[in-house]
Amino acid sequence: MFREFAQYSPYTSDQHAKSLASWEFVTWVLTQFDSVDTLLQDIETIRVVSVFDTYMKAEQPLHFFVADATGHAVVIEPINGVLKVFENPLGIMTNAPSFDWQMTNVHAMIKSLNPESTIMWQGMSIPIRTEGNGLKGLPGDMSPPSRFLQLAFAQATITQPKTSSEAIVAAIRALNRFCISEGMSVKNGTVGVTQWEVFADMTNKLFCYRSYGNMTLRKVDCNKITFDGKKITKHDIEKDKTVIVDVTNMLH
């Protein structure tokens, strides 16, 4: 979410043909483009406008992370009524504030850690230490800026996976750092939790996910789906509960 920062264009009837509500933007991207580059060629042809969502009973303050199978990733944010595009060399995003602020914060944190030794990664100097001290000094709270820092450094130090399964496991371990459980985030009587997590293998077109009520990892193989149908297919991610495997009989 991009609360307190999202600023959409005002809706005007003469611009109706190229206007999208915030929740329509993702569908537009996925159905019209096959790469980030082709999206960026047409990004200025549409406007994301201010629309009240009657279901959520609010305007949806969104920003967007877009990546393709080549690894090209960008963040798109509605600021002052304009869609601003930021190249995303880290391939990560959290909630507000703006992406450029988050990147400035990462650079500031790198300097403050005063590393004993460093590696260069994605053009950035990343501290490497032993005995678990490499991330000493990173904030551990669940705020979006802190989560951004934690994920940036966790991703920078992950051993390069050799298989799809290894990559998904590495992603799970990275996100485990800041899964928000009930009671950790309460605002105005509303309890905030990490409702679901998704892990996409864009090379093999696999979409894995788990939810707050079902931590069993589930997979959707997009190679087996026909995307030219006219019916929207749905699945309740909380329909089943976590599978706990009984290995008692396997003990020896």
Model-derived regions, located:
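Structural recognition of the beta-strand scaffold that forms the well-ordered cores
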Residues: 1-2, 65, 75, 199
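N-terminal accessory/precursor segments of enzymes
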Residues: 1-33
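Short, flexible loop/turn elements at secondary-structure junctions
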Residues: 6, 68-70, 80, 202
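Short, surface-exposed beta-strand-loop junctions and turns on beta-sheet-rich folds
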Residues: 6-8, 81-83, 213-217
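Short helix/loop capping segments that flank catalytic or ligand/cofactor-binding pockets
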Residues: 10-11, 74-77, 84-88, 209
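Proteins synthesized as precursors that undergo proteolytic processing into mature forms
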Residues: 21-52, 164-171
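Aromatic- and glycine-enriched pocket-lining scaffold segments that form the walls
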Residues: 35-36, 40-77
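C-terminus-biased signal that marks the final domain/tail of proteins
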Residues: 51-52, 59-60, 69, 91-252
